[in-house]
Amino acid sequence: QAASWTLKEEVTFNTTEINSTDWIKYPILKFSEVPEVEVAIINRPSKDVKGAGEVPVPPTAAAIANAIYNASGFRINDLPITPEKILNA
């Protein structure tokens, strides 16, 4: 979800309304585009159980943007980070 927000998802508008009104028009990562994720479960029975679903969302955009900067020297400061934005940086 966080990678999709960072790399693709964007609501588009024309002069009077939202263009991306359905899943066909709204860009989202496909399963074939999602990188493999390694999950590590830490056994800590003395600690309370916590949810982990939304924890990786905030740092994902920063991590991807910093990886692009480290590889290219270009900072991208607005989402989504698209190939066009990188080429025009």
PLM segments and residue spans:
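C-terminal catalytic domains of large/alpha subunits in multi-subunit enzymes
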Residues: Q1-A89
